Amino acid sequence: MRPTGRAAEQVRPITITRHYTKHAEGSVLVEFGDTKVLCNASVEEGVPRFLKGQGQGWVTAEYGMLPRSTHTRNAREAARGKQGGRTMEIQRLIARSLRAAVDLKKLGEYTITLDCDVIQADGGTRTASITGACVALVDALNKIVEAGKLKESPLKSMVAAVSVGIVDGEGRCDLEYVEDSAAETDMNVVMMEDGRMIEVQGTAEGEPFSHDELLSLLALAKGGLEDIFDAQRNALKQNALK
């Protein structure tokens, strides 16, 4: 049995609160059970040097965990003087995932930065970050359109992510920390709304997994992501753009 009594295919309760802070063009607090991430989308004119003059935009991301988002305090990476490898890996994953959501040519020479700050961690912080950041990105793109700077939103598709894994020999969707830390296989799946996959990260922590188990986990992720896309759509229906 799972820690909270969920079915193997069931995702945690999801809450997506838009317009969470007032300054960012897009701001979302996303909650997957006890995992809580603040996702802000900031719009700036101009693009990185390697894109100048190409008539396209850029989407990038930064990720961090507050010192007491975990069971014991972790020093801020700024205090240590450098980002850890895990942090850099996750923020690159978030950026790659959200770039897939946008037609960068239609965005024009704007840069959108997605800042994902983990307030409370209980597993799945990177997948929650992608899911929440996509909603913040939609609001930021709509702000550019509302300001008359773009004729239409360059959004191509919603993007969401979920973790799956094998725990005690059972495939499970949306792992909590206690499940993640005990998983024989751990996988993160990033998907577009039409079912096409952007990224699959899978690791066998103990016994290697079979091809059939891989397909089973991907099917489990696809089912969970349908619920997550529903949560995104429901959030975007609420609260008129501020």
UniProtKB/Swiss-Prot annotation:
Enzyme class: transferase
One annotated GO molecular function: tRNA nucleotidyltransferase activity
Family matches, as CDD domains: RNase_PH_bact (cd11362)
Gene Ontology biological process terms from the UniProt entry: rRNA catabolic process; rRNA processing; tRNA processing
Keywords from the named record: Nucleotidyltransferase, RNA-binding, rRNA processing, Transferase, tRNA processing, tRNA-binding
UniProt keyword Transferase present: yes
Positions bound to phosphate: R86, G124, T125, R126
Catalyzed reactions: tRNA(n+1) + phosphate = tRNA(n) + a ribonucleoside 5'-diphosphate
Keyword Repressor set for record: no
Subunit and partners: Homohexameric ring arranged as a trimer of dimers.
NCBIfam families registered for this protein in UniProt: RNasePH (TIGR01966)
Function per UniProt: Phosphorolytic 3'-5' exoribonuclease that plays an important role in tRNA 3'-end maturation. Removes nucleotide residues following the 3'-CCA terminus of tRNAs; can also add nucleotides to the ends of RNA molecules by using nucleoside diphosphates as substrates, but this may not be physiologically important. Probably plays a role in initiation of 16S rRNA degradation (leading to ribosome degradation) during starvation.
Name the record gives this protein: Ribonuclease PH
Organism: Photorhabdus laumondii subsp. laumondii (strain DSM 15139 / CIP 105565 / TT01) (Photorhabdus luminescens subsp. laumondii)
Primary gene name: rph
